[in-house]
Design a protein with these regions (language model features):
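Active-site histidine-anchored catalytic micro-motif
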Residues: 1-119
């Protein structure tokens, strides 16, 4: 999502500031992780699916499908916002860091991310 986020931000960015990103949903999350090797994304999904399984007999919130309650739990583990420093007019992220929208539903819908820049 890094490039998509950058394309939507106003230009130029402030020399010094903070970018806050907030996703307005409860079954997806935002994360910063390695963006070079696509295997990281595959491994993260496998790890999360191992930690939080679908169709557990103790889930009570099941009316939206077997993937819904696990999606809410995964969302809570990750969080719905990120804060990224802006330095010299650029997002001050590490070489291998990228912004991820983590979709936890099996078939997620459209998602809205609110971006707020503080100078």
């Amino acid at each position: 999502m890094t490039q998509e986020i950058l394309e939507q931000l106003p230009k130029p960015l402030p020399q010094i500031g903070i970018l806050n990103l907030f996703v307005q949903h409860t079954s997806c999350a935002l994360s910063i992780n390695e963006n070079y090797d696509p295997d990281v994304r595959t491994d993260m999904e496998a790890i999360l699916n191992h930690m939080v399984k679908e169709r557990e007999p103790y889930y009570e919130h099941t009316m939206e499908g077997s993937d819904d309650m696990p999606a809410h739990a995964k969302c809570s583990l990750f969080g719905v916002s990120l804060t990224i420093p802006i330095t010299n007019g650029r997002l001050n992220m590490g070489t291998w860091q990228g912004i991820y929208l983590c979709e936890f539903r099996n078939h997620g819908g459209s998602r809205k991310i609110v971006a707020t820049i503080y100078e």
